[in-house]
Curated annotation (Swiss-Prot):
<keyword id="KW-0564">Palmitate</keyword>
<keyword id="KW-1043">Host membrane</keyword>
<feature type="transmembrane region" description="Helical; Signal-anchor for type III membrane protein">
    <location>
        <begin position="23"/>
        <end position="43"/>
    </location>
</feature>
<keyword id="KW-1015">Disulfide bond</keyword>
<keyword id="KW-0472">Membrane</keyword>
<dbReference type="GO" id="GO:0020002">
    <property type="term" value="C:host cell plasma membrane"/>
</dbReference>
<dbReference type="GO" id="GO:0015078">
    <property type="term" value="F:proton transmembrane transporter activity"/>
</dbReference>
<dbReference type="Pfam" id="PF00599">
    <property type="entry name" value="Flu_M2"/>
</dbReference>
<dbReference type="GO" id="GO:0005216">
    <property type="term" value="F:monoatomic ion channel activity"/>
</dbReference>
<feature type="topological domain" description="Virion surface">
    <location>
        <begin position="1"/>
        <end position="22"/>
    </location>
</feature>
<keyword id="KW-0813">Transport</keyword>
<keyword id="KW-0597">Phosphoprotein</keyword>
<keyword id="KW-1083">Inhibition of host autophagy by virus</keyword>
<dbReference type="GO" id="GO:0044694">
    <property type="term" value="P:symbiont genome entry into host cell via pore formation in plasma membrane"/>
</dbReference>
<keyword id="KW-0945">Host-virus interaction</keyword>
<feature type="topological domain" description="Intravirion">
    <location>
        <begin position="44"/>
        <end position="97"/>
    </location>
</feature>
<feature type="region of interest" description="Disordered">
    <location>
        <begin position="60"/>
        <end position="88"/>
    </location>
</feature>
């Protein structure tokens, strides 16, 4: 149960919980949402690299190189790198006086 809805008090030398409205639908919904949030947070921290890489690049994975000779693969890599290098020339350095 949620710490916000329960009060723990010592009862007969043991810790017990006095909450009469634990069957309230709002309390149940809040507990479920809290548990789901905790699970998602833990998964996010464990797999954040995979998750954010997926969202950044999506399902795009470049063309398949299966059955392509290594020389053609290298040529394709060079073309792609040259295209990236050419894009760098579009940036203009502005100096303020």
């Amino acid at each position: 149960m949620s710490l916000l809805t329960e009060v723990e008090t010592p009862i007969r030398n043991e810790w017990g919980c006095r909450c009469n409205d634990s069957s309230d639908p709002l309390v149940v919904a809040a507990s479920i949402i809290g548990i789901l949030h905790l699970i998602l947070w833990i998964l996010d921290r464990l797999f954040f690299k995979c998750i954010y890489r997926f969202f950044k690049h999506g399902l795009k994975r470049g063309p398949s190189t299966e059955g392509v000779p290594e020389s053609m693969r290298e040529e394709y890599r060079k073309e792609q790198q040259n295209a990236v290098d050419a894009d760098d020339s579009h940036f203009v350095s502005i100096e303020l006086e």
